[in-house]
Amino acid sequence: MRDYLRPDEVDAMVQAARKSGRHRVRDATIIMMMYRHGLRTAELVALRWQQVDLKAGYLDVHRVKHGHDAKHPLRGPQLRLLRELQRTYPDSPYVFVSERKAPLSPRSIREIVARTGKLAGLPFVPHPHQLRHACGYYLASRGHDTRAIQDYLGHRNIQHTVRYTAMAPHRFENFWDD
């Protein structure tokens, strides 16, 4: 089994989350943010609103594994979901909370990702780290520089990033002009 999700699978999960359950906005936002920002589960559950600048469209990502913190751009779909989520839970300092307004646990995130994958009709049970890997593989497939991907994902060691570029389907296409 592959260790990442394809973009179409992630899109299916976001759409499935948006259509199901009373936490549809929260769950869709979780899937999208983990994918678009390569967030680890611990980074996601610790995410606070003070790290999110909805006006300027930026997210301050604090990496947990001694990586490099970074400021990531937030784009249209993420901004819309985050604004809607903030209206739903206006009093919490945490972005992703339970009904009791406590931060979600890593176990809850695993359950949300698994449930959303099932709702999306995936033939396997996805886990949260597959969304992080999906981010890396997607960025590599778009031809982004390995060092830039390393910084974006907060990898200290570039060897952790090289795995994504090694499988990029178009990595040799522009080596020769003729």
Model-derived features: positions:
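Conserved catalytic core of the tyrosine transesterase superfamily
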Residues: 1-178
